Amino acid sequence: MAKWVYTFGAGQAEGSAEDRDRLGGKGANLAEMCNLGLPVPPGLTIVTAACNSYLEKGRSMPEGLREQVREGITRMEKITGRVFGDTNRPLLLSVRSGARASMPGMMDTVLNLGLNDQSVHALGHDAGDARFAWDSYRRFIQMYGDVVMGVDHEVFEEVLEDEKARLGHEQDTELSAVEWQHVISRYKEAIEEVLGLPFPQDPEVQLWGAIGAVFSSWMNPRAITYRHLHGIPAGWGTAVNVQAMVFGNLGNSSATGVAFTRNPSTGEKELYGEFLVNAQGEDVVAGIRTPQNITEAARIASGSDKPSLEKLMPEAFAEFEKICNALERHYRDMQDIEFTIERGKLWMLQTRSGKRTAKSALKIAVDMAEEGLISKEEAVARIDPASLDQLLHPTIDPHARRDIIGSGLPASPGAATGEIVFSSDEAVQAVKEGRKVILVRVETSPEDIHGMHAAEGILTTRGGMTSHAAVVARGMGTPCVSGAGSIRVDQRNELLIAASVTLRKGDVITIDGSSGQVLKGEIPMLQPELSGDFGKIMQWADASRRMTVRTNAETPADARAARSFGAEGIGLCRTEHMFFEDDRINVMREMILAEDEAGRRTALAKLLPMQRSDFVELFSIMHGLPVTIRLLDPPLHEFLPKTDEEIAEVARVLTIDPAELRQRVDALHEFNPMLGHRGCRLAISYPEIAEMQARAIFEAAVQAAHDTGAAVVPEIMVPLVGLRAELDYVKARIEAVAKEVIGEAGVNIDYLIGTMIELPRAALRADTIAESADFFSFGTNDLTQTTFGISRDDAALFLATYQQKGIIEQDPFVSLDFEGVGELIQIAAERGRRTKNGLKLGICGEHGGDPASIRFCEEAGLDYVSCSPFRVPIARLAAAQATINGREVAEVQALAAS
């Protein structure tokens, strides 16, 4: 028969901290504390597999579970000298959840289980405090009624508030035993009125009702949401911990509290926490009474006139402080600890690794490494790479009031406040006038780049995490919320229409690009700080990692920002972004609208010095580091005007007939531009465009090498190649231009020509394509689109539904799809290197900044990842963790093999 139950108590436990997967975090740590000889109330843990079995079998308890729980309770009875269900010396229980990953507050708890109309008298007699017994009973009815029976907790709150008002009491603690009895009678009446059922008096019925409720809470909406947000698989299930109750509400020599072994906000090495005298655990969290400081130093710092635990109960405090230090040394991490003091006796109820801010995490990791508790590699592995966003961008003050008017996708982290503007030109003008703005659009296009650059933040009602707005905003480090479908933009009347409010141009909003929230008004911000601890962790990370980290950048500002964050080159320079500046877009349009090659070459001659100067600046900033430049990729219609007003204006500037321009725009329109006339197909149709870009690159390389003294080896990348012949055609044109420039300059130029792998055919035919390529860069944005057959700009319409319904666990445009897209990358890497040993491989899609995707890149043997500038520190840390993890896995495999 399966073993469903593991017991602990009296210094012995069947499990340990190693059994987290089986016993959940809480159960494993209770067992571990027990094995360490710490004062832990006896109990039992029902394994996570029992939860999965219960949910899979239509909420039916697994065979053998009831018998094993009964055996565990018998052991608890022997240790405590109390009997479950007895009316003289009743054993009361707590029933708590405990998943293997910490999910604070997401699942259910029941305390004081086992009380009924008879045993409450025995509890009062035994404790010598009738009021305590009736208070415990009403808490149990309230909790059980809500969690197990499904009666809204507000029903109980209304009864209690009504009774307090009738009696003239302010606090719960003022009610007497008799008064609590009256509240309990009303509670039971309310339950019967709502459900038509009496409150259960049989402790066995109570116990199994509570166990079932905790199992079921694994699938409650808030738990499901939390799992989605934190990447916790639904298949893990939760353990259930059934433990003998100890009471912090047994008078003024009793207390309950929560503490951290270091400050979770700052990371300072100090005992940090709160407690309440004469209270149960949930009172500390509920905020019904103001908690007191644990240490005297904290009390003095806070200015509180209430005594600290250190002063009030010095013996219990001294023991608690000693245990806290021992637990931190044992687990080698900052601990979050729950405790109860029952009539002077200290009991440990929980320990777990404490949640902490990014700033605190850095300090704790660095300090512990320098204290010798952990190694530098362990310190690097302790930091959540995604949390570094908190350090690189302003964030909303967590204590600030939020007036949320809508929400979308957290497309680019950080928070921003400004006046609403509805066009990019307005954004630029407002900034010239010294005003801060949020650019609000249905969706953005490349022509909005000037407004996006000027705005403090960007809000779009359409688009996903890899939409134009999201990608560009991340690259610029500008906060962005995309796909806010609950908000409507009335462009004509310049209105932002939300469910609760309609706002006009000039009204102030705040966007939180880290959560996706859109808020009315100006909200207080916290400014980012990069501490010395950040620098140390990055230094240790760089010493550990194998892959290099480049950036996606095409502007000097982006390139400088990326260098300051530690980028080791440019992995993707999107040359088309350089053509959207005001002084260039019309020259580009002149080229597109030219009637023949001669006309195109005339316009391209005007663009050449512009591109060359851009490349000179990028090469100079990178000072000898690799720079990968992608030739023109998007379809030409993206550069053309769209509305009648825009067409009229462009026709005026180019001195052509608006009707003729409209006709040309319509002729270039494509039904599916993502799969249309773009990438290398443009270079083959109009080779003069690729030739101009190649000349600009080579001339810039010569000049930058002369100016800086650093060797410049440009890497020219041909996009959207599916056939080797396509690459061969474009490569021949590039090499011809290189030969011309070398002859003109009288100096040799080293360069590489490679391709983006962004089509499934290219991945499958990588062996032949590698014969003509010096490097591959995986363009995972398009490779994901073409593998799934999903347009990333439309994906937001249904991918969220897919996640909610469990069809996919992650948005494949945010975190790489390892099974499909990932396999294509592995195939291309293996086949490409089989043809050309040492072929350089990198990734330059948005996945280059995603920690899970970076881990995959390490496993696939890629040489570098490339991401937006503000994600470079995240990628450096994630790449180091991937290397460390890979080394550990290899060591385990080698050990197993021997």
Curated annotation (Swiss-Prot):
Molecular functions per Gene Ontology: ATP binding; kinase activity; metal ion binding; pyruvate, phosphate dikinase activity
InterPro entries: ATP_grasp_subdomain_1, PEP-util_enz_mobile_dom, PEP_util_AS, PEP_util_C, PEP_util_CS, Phosphohistidine_dom_sf, PPDK_AMP/ATP-bd, Pyruvate_phosphate_dikinase
Post-translational events: Phosphorylation of Thr-466 in the dark inactivates the enzyme. Dephosphorylation upon light stimulation reactivates the enzyme.
Top-level taxon in the UniProt lineage: Bacteria
Region called Central, residue ranges: 413-511
Binding site for substrate: R574, R630, E758, G779, T780, N781, D782
UniProt keyword Acetylation present: no
Region (Linker 2): 512-546
Binding site residues for ATP: R96
Region N-terminal, annotated ranges: 1-355
Reaction catalysed by this enzyme: pyruvate + phosphate + ATP = phosphoenolpyruvate + AMP + diphosphate + H(+)
EC number: 2.7.9.1
Regulation of its activity: Activated by light-induced dephosphorylation. Inhibited by dark-induced phosphorylation. Both reactions are catalyzed by PDRP1.
PROSITE patterns, A to Z: PEP_ENZYMES_2, PEP_ENZYMES_PHOS_SITE
Keywords associated with the record: ATP-binding, Kinase, Magnesium, Metal-binding, Nucleotide-binding, Phosphoprotein, Transferase
Catalytic residues in the record: H468, C844
Region (C-terminal): 547-898
Binding site for Mg(2+): E758, D782
Miscellaneous comment: The reaction takes place in three steps, each mediated by a carrier histidine residue located on the surface of the central domain. The two first partial reactions are catalyzed at an active site located on the N-terminal domain, and the third partial reaction is catalyzed at an active site located on the C-terminal domain. For catalytic turnover, the central domain swivels from the concave surface of the N-terminal domain to that of the C-terminal domain.
Assembly behavior: Homodimer.
Entry's family note: Belongs to the PEP-utilizing enzyme family.
Free-text comment on this protein's domains from its UniProt entry: The N-terminal domain contains the ATP/Pi active site, the central domain the pyrophosphate/phosphate carrier histidine, and the C-terminal domain the pyruvate active site.
UniProt function note: Catalyzes the reversible phosphorylation of pyruvate and phosphate.
Protein name as it appears in the record: Pyruvate, phosphate dikinase
Gene coding for it: ppdK
